[in-house]
Amino acid sequence: MDENTRLQVLADIEKYERLGEFDRHVDPVDMSMALPVDENYQYIPKGFLKIKRELERKIYVEPFRKKANKNILKTEFRGRENLEGLGGAIITCNHVNKFDCLAVGQAAKGHRVYFIGAPFNNMKGFMGEMMRAGGLLPLSDNMTAMKNLNRAISALLAKGNMVTCYPEQAMWWNYEKPRPFKDGAFSIAVMNKVPIVPMFITFRNSGEFDANGIEIKYMTVNIMKPIYPDVTLSRRENVNRMREENYRMCCEKYEEIYQKKLEYVTGE
């Protein structure tokens, strides 16, 4: 994202917060750069493709993820003890940077982490190859593909992997506040009888500024205690309870880190 685009994105974020439209995409999307996600898409690759992806992950993705968090993003991690002893789980996180998947993946190091993403993330070229090797599970408007995705998620969770879902839906660059959550992540957790692992990214000032005077921010990934489904509740009750609890935890973490009350500027 160049400096001029950043200014427009920040203006759009301010506009949509005032309108209460927290799930609007504000970053330019170029679908011409995306590969189709149809009924033939291999969410869990087999044969040669499996070997290729594993090699790409070990040779390129994991070393880059480690170096990027340490040297570029300067990410800090708090609460890793909350991941101890966990197997399959759904990670939720606020979506505030194109590369926050690198921070989430590093936060859960020691676990294999996959990422549910919008179809436009299934990119052509080297970047797309690295995203797929890094665990991208793209959504689709193809019903058969979506059924395949749901089956793949269940299989991955059953094997003890973690799957990341961004319940706010859209990426809002450097946005500090938690936004209202969609049901998807919590429905998946309830259906598969696995916990939610809430993560919430907060920002630290760097003291450095870009060409437009916008301060460069460093991320801290706050890993909170898992939220488990309640076997005594119905599916809908569980989804609502887990979603509301996750959102409450993020709101409390926001107020703890920034030392101010969470308030949205809306209706003006």
Language model: regions and residue ranges:
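Short, charge-rich binding segments
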Residues: 82-84, 106-107, 154-158
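Short, glycine/polar-rich helix-capping loops at beta-to-alpha or helix-loop-helix junctions
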Residues: 52, 122-127, 207, 216
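A conditional alpha-helix N-cap/helix-loop micro-motif detector
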Residues: 73, 142-147, 178-179
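Non-catalytic C-terminal accessory region of glycerolipid acyltransferases
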Residues: 1-35, 150-268
